[in-house]
């Protein structure tokens, strides 16, 4: 059995000058094992003043945000774009993406730019198996959040 440091360590590039290693959090997203996708996806301010926008879109060939193309993280279905410090960006930016199959362009917003909608009490009761109206919390609950209808 491997220790947790070995399991969570990012993979190394097998060949010098080969494709870059994929970070551990992005690899966990790709494999569906990340416990908190909000940690990686969405809009994140960086210490140097830049902003990173990151999405996971397995159905997309290409993705654009804030008027520019996002780069695919090699070997994954994650796309990201780093915006310069001081760049104007909507809190919930519109994503434009091209479908892999048909090539059609669509637009949407990333759900990971919105705050989590399940409260602590609901999570606690659900975890205990004592939430007797969980259908009011989970699933498709049509709402308007931050002025955006249909969230």
What are these regions (language model features)?
Residues 2-47, 73-151:
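The feature marks proteins involved in alpha-glucan
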Residues 56-62:
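Short proline/glycine-enriched turn/loop motifs at strand-loop junctions of beta-rich domains
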Residues 64-66:
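Beta-strand signatures of extracellular beta-sandwich domains
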Residues 68-71:
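Beta-strand-rich interaction surfaces with strong enrichment in secreted/lumenal proteins
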């Amino acid at each position: 059995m491997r220790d947790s440091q070995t399991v969570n360590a990012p993979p190394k590039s097998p060949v010098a000058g080969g494709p870059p290693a994929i970070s551990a959090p992005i690899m966990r997203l790709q494999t569906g094992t990340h416990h908190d996708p909000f940690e990686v996806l969405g809009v994140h301010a960086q210490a140097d003043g830049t902003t990173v926008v990151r999405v996971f879109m397995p159905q997309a060939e290409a993705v654009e945000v804030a008027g520019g193309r996002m780069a695919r993280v090699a070997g994954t279905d994650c796309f990201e774009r780093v915006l310069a410090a001081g760049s104007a960006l909507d809190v919930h930016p519109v994503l434009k993406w091209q479908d892999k199959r048909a090539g059609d362009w669509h637009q949407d917003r990333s759900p990971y730019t919105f705050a989590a909608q399940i409260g602590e009490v609901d999570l606690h009761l659900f975890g205990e198996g004592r939430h007797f109206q969980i259908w009011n919390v989970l699933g498709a609950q049509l709402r308007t959040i931050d002025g955006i209808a249909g969230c």
